[in-house]
Amino acid sequence: MNSIKFPVLDRTTKNSVISTTLNDLSNWSELSSLWPLLYGTSCCFIEFASLIGSRFDFDRYGLVPRSSPRQADLILTAGTVTMKMAPSLVRLYEQMPEPKYVIAMGACTITGGMFSTDSYSTVRGVDKLIPVDVYLPGCPPKPEAVIDAITKLRKKIAREIYKDRIRPQQGNRCFTTNHKFFVVRSPHTGNYDQELLYPPSSTSEISTETFFKYKSPVSSHELVN
């Protein structure tokens, strides 16, 4: 067999011989053995935990949960991500070997969800921190939807090119921008407002003469009427 040219197959080739390429072989081995790192922070992770049971049995897809990012090639984020958790999430992603993939599960992970409304400590989408391959909306998504997302990721891996996959992804990674915070005085400090105790000089004042001029005793009959 010539290592430079493609082998010539004829009708005499046995059925047990499989002709393929290195790219397809690499993609097949990758999609058949996805080892996920479960990054669950909220209620969406409970739905993913139901996949471990015998009803859905996610082991048939070759998914083996790992506790170390150095042994995982898929990170599944489920739940709200806060500003304090953002550096930890990015660090876990950086520790994963190439090639690596990300599934964003749930509305809180994709857009921040209801926790992002008037919140200064919630990240409005993990795609501002790490690149996301598959978005899985829902609050929370059903286990069937998680299986569908894994199937779509497997199809994406099957269409990848080997050279593009092993290429470092330093230029394609996106990180969160620096958020500018402004110091605002809290109205509930337990202290009296100085403006109420000491009104500004621009406030109109009543002179002493005017005060005593209109000050007169009022009878009870006038109060009743």
UniProtKB/Swiss-Prot annotation:
Binds 1 [4Fe-4S] cluster. It is found in: Plastid, Chloroplast thylakoid membrane. It is a peripheral membrane protein. One of its GO terms (cellular component) is respiratory chain complex I. Belongs to the complex I 20 kDa subunit family. One of its GO terms (biological process) is electron transport coupled proton transport. NDH shuttles electrons from NAD(P)H:plastoquinone, via FMN and iron-sulfur (Fe-S) centers, to quinones in the photosynthetic chain and possibly in a chloroplast respiratory chain. The immediate electron acceptor for the enzyme in this species is believed to be plastoquinone. Couples the redox reaction to proton translocation, and thus conserves the redox energy in a proton gradient. Its EC number is 7.1.1.-. NDH is composed of at least 16 different subunits, 5 of which are encoded in the nucleus. InterPro entries: NADH_UbQ_OxRdtase-like_20kDa (IPR006137), NADH_UQ_OxRdtase_20Kd_su (IPR006138). This is NAD(P)H-quinone oxidoreductase subunit K, chloroplastic. GO terms for molecular function: 4 iron, 4 sulfur cluster binding; iron ion binding; NADH dehydrogenase (ubiquinone) activity; quinone binding. Its cofactor is [4Fe-4S] cluster. It comes from the Eukaryota. The lineage of its organism: Eukaryota, Viridiplantae, Streptophyta, Embryophyta, Tracheophyta. Keywords: 4Fe-4S, Chloroplast, Iron, Iron-sulfur, Membrane, Metal-binding, NAD, NADP, Plastid, Plastoquinone, Quinone, Thylakoid, Translocase, Transport. HAMAP family: NDH1_NuoB. It catalyses: a plastoquinone + NADH + (n+1) H(+)(in) = a plastoquinol + NAD(+) + n H(+)(out); a plastoquinone + NADPH + (n+1) H(+)(in) = a plastoquinol + NADP(+) + n H(+)(out). [4Fe-4S] cluster binds at residues 43-44, 108, 139. Its main location: plastid.
